[in-house]
Regions:
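A subset of solvent-exposed loop/turn segments in beta-rich extracellular surface proteins, enriched
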Residues: 217, 221-250, 278-310, 359-363, ...
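Sec-dependent N-terminal signal peptides
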Residues: 4-13
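Outer membrane beta-barrel
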Residues: 183, 187-242, 248-280, 401, ...
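Alpha-helical interaction/regulatory segments in DNA maintenance proteins
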Residues: 29-43, 72, 81-83, 88-124, ...
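Transmembrane beta-strand segments of Gram-negative outer membrane beta-barrel proteins
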Residues: 118-148, 166, 170-176, 206, ...
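Amphipathic, charged-and-aliphatic alpha-helical interface segments
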Residues: 37-85, 104-107, 178-180
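Boundary at the C-terminal end of the N-terminal hydrophobic targeting segment
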Residues: 17-19
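Exposed, low-structure sequence patches enriched in small/polar residues
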Residues: 153-157, 254-256, 310-348, 355-673
Length: 673
């Protein structure tokens, strides 16, 4: 009874635990270079809160919010004092500050609170979401064909999304997604479905339909949320072993389609899966024996033109595999096998940088991974070998030196002939191939108001790369970010990053031949530098109004040329009262070239995201309005517009707009029942 009274008191005193925290605050980054898949995976986690009385170490650490010491404190408290009565009880865990709990709040729930305190909530619920979006100006792809340009998009410029899900956190999840991109002919161009059953005796997890799989450090299967290198320099270094999760994203690649089963007996787990899914791919003309090959996989998901439609489902992929692991409360060791077969051989173009790329119809991966947690640190790693003989390895450690200092260290090596189609381990390259690197990150918190984070990453590429006509190139990247929180409702941050790589640089050279002046193109691999700066200020002016201000800038330079520059400034405001909420932005940007494009996170309708690259010169505006029609029905409307200065068109190719501005609208309604 005393515990319940304490929780009620905490709920009255600390109501801002459930205060709105921006995506940018949680992600801890300016979102530059963050992939669409990363955001989609993060949104899936946010839309399915975890029960703090049922969550295990791997799942909670997978949120990348709590440090090693904080994770230990959480589980020690739960072990010593029993189940949490409410999420407010988390304030009694000594290591968990209010700022940490604000970041954690969107991802957690407490069934004990529902059962004990009698909250009017349902564990099982269904929701249906419908979304429409469109660019208001006409793109060339939707105009009438001309004699010189006859290729056009197949259908209307409206993009549709229909999504349904029923979820009971204890045992069952059913859902489907139907999507059509702008210009596509079929309103069911992409469909996805899943059925998940959990916690039925030794059957821990069964998924039928579409799913992702994350084991070890993501060398073989890395289908989970991870930012890699970011302003969160410690926690994103390590990947948790999450097993299989239903796939509910609108991205049309990077998932399995079939059956996954996960069994648990005491501290042992066994997992098996099979997948049979069609992939988009570029088909080549039949060879002399009539064999049809594909040159590359297509991941855009667009099927708007004749050529894009021809690439749709051109390659059939069959995958199967399994694994076994042993897990204690804070440690895990496991092995995994994965076999992949294609119905057509993959044959890359004959380029030097493609010499070690995958070719053929099958790939086999064998993987060993481990994670061991001490009282102050975690050591982790994975070693994976493909049947080509290539291998990948990730070895790392993260830990809390004391209450003020956290540190991470990671080494990775991916040989040029290592092949993993679902890998997403920590790396500089977008794929885990042809790279060796070592990363060191640090976080220092001298007081509750101040925090600074930094990392240094050195990387080396033993073989040629695309647009790098030389083997054995190298580079480094370093970042420093300062956070200052003068009060509970305001925050100031500044971030500086420097990246150095070796890349191709081309220029024109004049020469004499037969008494005539001619020009030729000279290409040389040379160091390339890019500096970026981001600053952020947020403040809650009243209980209903908050503001955010951002300034970003960059400089880009090859060794032989003068630097080019770009910058952007934006002002946001958000108002909410009762059932209404409104967010607006005005931004100005000016960049000398595309290399200096400025990335800035934008608020969107729920379960959607936007982080466009501002480049050129102009103004950017948007507004997002939401209204709770009743407790079960919510409506969103988003409008955005970019006005460019000193240019007559926007975009290129079939996406070109013949006026210097672009406007987009998006409407969404969600019904919870």
């Amino acid at each position: 009874m005393k515990k319940i009274l304490l929780l009620i008191l905490l709920g009255i005193i600390m109501p801002n635990l459930q205060a709105q925290v921006s995506n940018e605050d949680i992600l801890g980054t300016s979102t530059e270079g963050v992939s669409e898949e990363t955001f989609e995976n993060w949104l899936q986690i946010q839309s399915h809160p975890i029960d703090i009385n049922r969550v295990d170490y791997e799942s909670l650490s997978g949120l990348a919010i709590l440090s090693t010491a904080q994770l230990r404190a959480f589980f020690d408290y739960r072990k010593n004092f029993g189940p949490f009565m409410s999420i407010y009880e988390l304030q009694s865990v000594p290591e968990l500050s209010l700022e940490i709990l604000k970041k954690l709040a969107p991802f957690i729930t407490c069934e004990q609170e529902i059962n004990t305190l009698g909250r009017d909530l349902k564990l099982a619920k269904s929701w249906l979401l419908i979304r429409f979006s469109q660019t208001l100006e006409e793109k060339r792809g939707f105009s009438l064909p001309t004699k010189t340009s006859i290729v056009r998009y197949a259908n209307s410029p409206v993009k549709n999304l229909l999504r349904y899900k029923y979820a009971n956190p204890k045992s069952l999840s059913i859902g489907f997604t139907i999507e059509k991109d702008e210009g596509e002919n079929n309103w069911t161009d992409f469909t996805s479905f899943h059925l998940q059953i959990q916690n039925k005796g030794i059957l821990k997890n069964l998924i039928i339909g579409d799913y992702q799989l994350q084991m070890g450090q993501g060398l073989a299967t890395g289908g989970g949320f991870s930012l890699g290198k970011s302003a969160e320099t410690i926690l994103f270094t390590r990947k948790p072993t999450l097993g299989g999760r239903p796939y509910t994203s609108t991205l049309e690649s990077g998932f399995f389609r079939g059956v996954l089963a996960n069994f648990q007996w005491r501290k042992w787990e066994g997992l098996g899966f099979i997948s049979h899914v069609s992939r988009d791919a570029n088909q080549l003309e039949p060879d002399s024996l009539g064999v049809v090959s594909v040159s590359s996989l297509q991941t855009s998901g667009f099927h708007r033109t004749t050529s894009e439609i021809a690439d749709k489902n051109a390659l059939l992929e069959t995958s199967l595999g399994g694994g076994i692991s042993y897990q204690s409360e804070f440690s895990r060791i496991g092995m995994m096998f994965q076999y992949t077969n294609f119905d057509k051989p993959i044959l890359k173009t004959n380029k030097t940088y493609n010499q070690f790329e995958f070719a053929g119809v099958q790939n086999i991966l064998m993987s060993f991974y481990y994670n061991y947690t001490l009282s102050f640190a975690q050591v982790f790693g994975e070693i994976t070998r493909s049947n080509s003989g290539g291998y990948g390895a990730v070895l790392g450690a993260i830990g809390s030196l004391n209450r003020r200092w956290d540190m991470s260290l990671l080494f990775r090596k991916f040989t040029p002939d290592f092949h993993s189609f679902y890998g997403n381990a920590f790396s500089e390259n977008t794929r885990n191939i042809n790279e060796t690197g070592i990363y060191w990150g640090v976080k220092f918190m001298p007081s509750r108001r101040w925090q600074w984070t930094a990392y240094v990453d050195y990387f080396y590429f033993p073989w040629y790369k695309y647009l790098v006509d030389k083997p054995r190139t190298q580079g480094f990247e370093t970042l420093l970010k300062l956070n200052y929180q003068p009060s509970k409702v305001s925050r100031i941050s500044g971030q500086l990053r420097l990246e150095n790589k070796e890349e191709n640089f081309s220029w024109k050279e004049s020469y004499l031949e037969n008494n005539k002046t001619k020009t030729r193109t000279i290409t040389e691999v040379t160091p390339r530098y890019r500096w970026t700066f981001n600053s952020y200020y947020s403040n809650k002016l009243t209980s209903n109004i908050s503001i955010q201000s951002r300034i970003s800038g960059s400089a880009f330079k090859f060794k032989q040329q003068n630097a080019t520059y770009g910058w952007a400034i934006s002002q946001d405001a958000k108002w909410s009262k009762g059932a209404w909420s409104l967010a607006v932005r005005t931004a100005y940007f000016s960049t000398q070239d595309y290399d200096n494009r400025q990335y800035t996170y934008e608020q969107d309708v729920q379960y959607a995201f936007s982080f466009p690259a501002y480049y050129g010169q102009g103004w950017r505006y948007y507004s997002v309005l939401s209204y709770d029609i009743n407790k079960n029905l919510t409506f969103w409307l988003r409008w955005s517009r970019t006005d460019y200065i000193n240019q007559e068109t926007v975009g290129s190719g079939l996406d070109e707009i013949p006026v210097p501005h672009r406007s987009d609208v998006k409407a969404q309604i969600r019904w919870v029942f």
